[in-house]
């Protein structure tokens, strides 16, 4: 077997896990508002058990009434949720998976409005600007809170859980006691290391007492807080050793607090296993099993981690969202079939914070596992025009439902603009996602025709039953900007693909995600780069965690930023612009002297043009009298996030 270490069993306390693949706890907002788990929750976890994950950890579950961090958080502070939990554990056990459940009090990272009560922490220090200031927990209350963890663990056991995981990381309640950065107490729970760890010890004692050694007890900890004055990796080694002495059966090692959530969520550009060395240091300090987590997507790297003895199990967090059958495919050595997480954070982290059910750019089935993929009532001849990710998603889904599907691509490469999105620094993983879609289409039997431009006449002759227009978008060219048609101007897509020569000194026009990443791409190559944007900041549409690293690159390469600048004319060597922040300022400003001007103001639909306020879908309108069903998906409708494109493509294919 290729991954013999990853598929070997392991003992964690009284629990035997069949392999080393772990689903870590991830907020998903699938739970009901009353704190019970929904049927969607059952199907979601059950699907990952079918995919042969050995240990599945249920998301952070509230252990104290008045500590609910969000409207869709499951709760175990009373018996109300035991029955729904049993449905999840039964579904997972049926597939041979073990189930752990994370026990959490959000503490200072909570929300008083959602909780219906003041939030609490070791000390009355807000976790960040704009967050609620917590109440300092009284000495007597600390003992009461510890008992709450024990009672919740007992309920988890009654619900069929094989283990509980006490959340001691990421700045939540327990972590707020543990860290000298947030614990300023002078009672028996503050001051020296032993006192700051006392709350953790009390919790472990209560959980052990209530569960009587029948289930495993794990703790989730940080490898480092990544904060000045906080717990560093050296400190966390001592914490890990202390927790083992307290009787913990295993450790799940994550990283950082929310003020450094770029290391919690690890966006595109952060490599898989970015905290592996820190976890390895902790592993050296304990004799109990250690789970490592941190943007793992590929089994090869996980196998190496186990082989080297740097951890005992590997958690595939967002990868389990992207492809719930990752272990099964690894077992069968179908590695090209893996759908990799690209760490875009668009549907998982963004929705989690917004209180919406999570979804996934590369896996539109996420959150819809309960519905399944129904066979088509009648097989149709379906033409999908456009081989970007939306087109491939629609084609693959329609083919799986039993339709006769042909996918047309006008160029010699599949992937559309998403393929170009892989060119900027740190975005190379996107190619893996595109390749996985190509393989899916090929293996499903989609008829793929490259270098083929579809015409209305062709459709008249071929008589398909349905056409899905997934023709994507092209560079946005705003006609009111004088000189924008100048042939010397290089489009960002041409710059990325290397189809136009680029001079040393470059001005990028457009500071959204496309322009900002193009500027980063050029600066890394050694170009002297400036960027101009109408809004008051560069990259305001870039996911927060990714933008942090993007702006670090801007500083590293000395990229000059011109903001609040409404470009009025483009020249071969620069632009003129007005002050967009002050309409009363009629001054015309200029920046000149560049070797190349790159236009990266975003994209617009290929088959859309605007006449005043009216949007006309030219090709779609033309086809309505030719084809019984015409659908448009993704950027063909309007330029949007890839998340919206794949979701829309899946839904259209589902309803053919």
Locate the predicted segments by residue.
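Glycine/Thr-rich phosphate-binding loops of Rossmann-like dinucleotide-binding domains
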Residues: 32, 66, 174, 227, ...
